[in-house]
């Protein structure tokens, strides 16, 4: 699936979930702000494809994408599990601040074209990562939210986990599948055979969004 398909499908799914839990959500005893999770899920939906040199993140992190096999370790349940543990353990404001800073920097690296980690020495690279408008704006917004609502940090990690997990689930509908049982098995599992950049991906997109719209209508009806 392309990045646009992953982001659109994952964000739409999380948006309906947030609509269903707009008054708040408890995730294993941890307070979650669903709409904060929607935003971070849109970022999380792109992260697994850091192993593709042509992807937005892969271009930023060439040293990773060139040495990683596509649909390898990033398409297992390892990262979502780590994010799950982080979500359950991030209960202090200091931890929330650290999470906000890291996600803000990540957003800057992903969406600011001026951040090129292939150029300059280590100090130039650090400057480019830290000093960019999109990254700084994201960081400031997240930090403000952290002080207004202490649940922001956990919500960010929860959203990243959901976005990453949805990406993997969506790729299970691709003919190449994912090694979700790694390290117990390296075999790729798939439940359908839709192909990337093929008319069948468009069909997958329509079916997914159609199902999301139906779910949204059911949620709205139950709330009336």
Identify the residue ranges that each predicted region occupies.
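N-terminal membrane-targeting hydrophobic helices
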Residues: 1-224
């Amino acid at each position: 699936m392309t990045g646009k398909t992953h982001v659109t499908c994952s964000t739409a799914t999380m948006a309906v979930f947030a609509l269903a839990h707009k008054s708040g959500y408890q995730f294993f005893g941890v307070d979650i702000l669903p709409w904060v999770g929607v935003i971070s899920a849109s970022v999380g939906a792109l992260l697994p494809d850091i192993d593709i040199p042509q992807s937005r993140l892969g271009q930023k992190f060439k040293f990773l994408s060139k040495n990683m096999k596509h649909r390898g370790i990033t398409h297992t349940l390892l990262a979502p599990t780590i994010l799950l543990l982080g979500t359950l353990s991030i209960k202090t404001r200091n931890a929330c601040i650290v999470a906000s800073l890291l996600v803000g920097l990540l957003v800057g690296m992903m969406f600011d074209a001026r951040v090129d980690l292939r150029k300059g020495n280590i100090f130039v690279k650090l400057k480019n990562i830290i000093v960019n408008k999109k990254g700084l704006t994201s960081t400031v917004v997240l930090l403000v939210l952290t002080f207004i609502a202490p649940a922001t940090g956990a919500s960010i990690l929860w959203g990243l986990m959901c976005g990453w997990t949805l990406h993997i689930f969506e790729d299970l509908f691709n003919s190449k599948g994912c090694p979700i049982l790694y390290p117990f098995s390296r075999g790729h599992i798939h439940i359908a055979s839709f192909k990337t950049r093929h008319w069948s991906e468009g069909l997958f997109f329509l079916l997914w969004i159609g199902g999301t719209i139906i779910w949204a209508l059911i949620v709205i009806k139950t709330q009336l």
